[in-house]
Amino acid sequence: MIDLKLLREDPDAVRRSQQSRGEDPSLVDALLAADAARRAAISTADTLRAEQKSASKSVGAASPEQRPALLARAKELAEQVKAAETAQAEAEAAFTAAHLAISNVVIDGVPAGGEDDFAVLDVVGEPTALENPRDHLELGETLGLIDMARGAKVSGSRFYFLTGKGALLQLGLLQLALRLAVENGFVPMIPPVLVRPEVMAGTGFLGAHAEEVYRIEADDLYLVGTSEVPLAGYHADEILDLSAGPLRYAGWSSCFRREAGSYGKDTRGVIRVHQFDKVEGFVYCTPADAEAEHQRLLGWQREMLARIEVPYRVIDVAAGDLGSSAARKFDCEAWVPTQQTYRELTSTSNCTTFQARRLSTRYRDGGDAKGKPQIAATLNGTLGTTRWLVAILENHQQPDGSVRVPEALVPFVGTELLEPVGPRG
């Protein structure tokens, strides 16, 4: 949820944010009206309750002659209080709905526009030049790493098996990511992948993109599309001690996405699938530290990309391509030779206080146990995921169809070269 203080003091800033996202700025006026109506309803109900309390006391002290009139007035006030409380509840519900409808306020400097309006911040390495490159699926099948056919047989489209060295390659990548995280002060976690609706909603994943989420209807639980969700819920309804600096967690989990809006897109291979594995960094910090922490997350992502030795670029994602919770997002996109373009491997988002306000995650101002609780800031960032196999296989392929294993992953895979295997099974 956005900060109501900002809304009331500078509604134009919120309107500008909505416009830069390509979203309806009139929602800001609807929220202002709902806020005013809610406060008026609360005031009316409070006034009537105070009057009712005073009238009740008067009845007890009244003379027999005065009592009938006072009792009638008390009854009338009771009915008015009941009606006012109903009106207050309705106003509160309307306010909450209006509040939830507005996306996070984007940070100054974020490019306006949609998916293609990003700004390129840096380009690292030259695009890999190959004659007649094989795509990652052809390589994966030839090398005995990926089995899409049996994945589809068992589970349907966009499912797969990672087999043999393919499984070791992914496990090595994620172990490398987790090791990097631990070296930089992250607490490693293996979180639950099923969460309650309030946690999924609190992170902003049940809004416009709710159709992307798998729901277990019988248990009213949701399968997470990223461990950002359970890690954001980890400190819900808590007051944190941030006096020693940010709290950093690294979650390793399977992730599940319906890809409901992706019909016909990336149907080949493991670029866009229903299930994958990921190590996700998640940070709680003070709002004042959030932008610096965002740069740190980006730096750790870049370090991981350097370790897998692929060319990539860093982009500042345009406002219209941000999720509702993000105030700014940087993506690292690796070069994919067979597509002759860059594809996203990592994203890191500064969600400012948006998620923490929904989940009631606060910290003590100044670290003082008696300090006033303030809303914390949250950030997240990918440190490694299944999609990285695409960039590794395609950029490190050799003319004979083998693939060189990046040096950092050799200890995990057990070989420097992935070579074609004969038919099995």
UniProtKB/Swiss-Prot annotation:
InterPro entries: aa-tRNA-synt_IIb, aa-tRNA-synth_II, aa-tRNA-synth_II/BPL/LPL, Ser-tRNA-ligase_type_1, Ser-tRNA-synth_1_N, SerRS_1_N_sf, SerRS_core, tRNA-bd_arm. GO terms for molecular function: ATP binding; serine-tRNA ligase activity. ATP binds at residues 257-259, 273, 344-347. Gene3D superfamilies: Bira Bifunctional Protein, Domain 2, Serine-tRNA synthetase, tRNA binding domain. Its main location: cytoplasm. Keywords: Aminoacyl-tRNA synthetase, ATP-binding, Cytoplasm, Ligase, Nucleotide-binding, Protein biosynthesis. It catalyses: tRNA(Ser) + L-serine + ATP = L-seryl-tRNA(Ser) + AMP + diphosphate + H(+); tRNA(Sec) + L-serine + ATP = L-seryl-tRNA(Sec) + AMP + diphosphate + H(+). One of its GO terms (biological process) is selenocysteine biosynthetic process. Its EC number is 6.1.1.11. It is an enzyme of class 6 (ligase). L-serine binds at residues 226-228, 280, 382. It is found in: Cytoplasm. GO terms for cellular component: cytoplasm. It comes from the Bacteria. Pathway: Aminoacyl-tRNA biosynthesis; selenocysteinyl-tRNA(Sec) biosynthesis; L-seryl-tRNA(Sec) from L-serine and tRNA(Sec): step 1/1. The keyword Ligase applies. Catalyzes the attachment of serine to tRNA(Ser). Is also able to aminoacylate tRNA(Sec) with serine, to form the misacylated tRNA L-seryl-tRNA(Sec), which will be further converted into selenocysteinyl-tRNA(Sec). HAMAP family: Ser_tRNA_synth_type1. Homodimer. The tRNA molecule binds across the dimer. Consists of two distinct domains, a catalytic core and a N-terminal extension that is involved in tRNA binding. This is Serine--tRNA ligase.
